[in-house]
């Protein structure tokens, strides 16, 4: 039972305050949680379908990376009306068990590359006021694929060279446009 914990911060605080949920080796942090974000994707033909993205709780979706990954489709956040059409999804307590093409909801579930086989997570239990601890990727839940749309932090591994990313301020001194692309 984790009542009144619909946000990552509140979940981490409760997890560290309660003796029955505390870790012996260190405190829980947002990176230990699996955040499941629901979107509505509009396809090129105008049809809409839900999409769920699971990523570590210390990350947010980078909208530019999301747009590039889904292009030419367009995404928007789930709204209250969308939750009304999917009563099995409890806002703030959504877990991967309710997601995926094979699930009852049938909602496509893509995960961040950091959610790899064998990693353990705290995530929603699909019941208001409840979360599941030590849910293991590929053992307790599976995704329908991988999507790399999380914001990038200084020190993250570089996907191209294997080194580490170093973020710095820059200035754009030119811009080349490619015909046929939306800008």
Regions found by a protein language model. Name each.
Residues 1-183:
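Extended, low-hydrophobicity, polar/charged segments
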